[in-house]
Amino acid sequence: MGSRCAKLSTGHGPAQNTGHSRGHESSMKKLVACVSQDNFSLSSEGEEEEEDEEDEEEEDDDEEDEEEEQIPVKGKLLLLEPEKQDGAEDAVAQPSPEPKQKHS
């Protein structure tokens, strides 16, 4: 991924000579895009798990009024999930299949 970013930057080299401010802005934007893409990849892998758990807690707070019975059940699932309840994790955290991939 990093090499692709570098290629884009070098491709914009000559453009910098013709229009300094324009070329510079363009190359900067490309670099920022590359960096954010790189960061995004890392984020989706590392932070996804944390976000997942936070999401569950938020949901629990929301559902407290509607279905209080689900809270202890979800709490138990949360504790078991990361260790061995892969199936339960999938059922509880459907929107984020990322952590499951890390397990495999």
Curated annotation (Swiss-Prot):
GO terms for cellular component: cytoplasm; nucleosome; nucleus. InterPro entries: PRMP3. Its main location: nucleus. It is found in: Nucleus; Chromosome. The keyword Nucleus applies. Keywords: Chromosome, Developmental protein, Differentiation, DNA condensation, DNA-binding, Nucleosome core, Nucleus, Phosphoprotein, Spermatogenesis. Belongs to the protamine P3 family. This is Protamine-3.
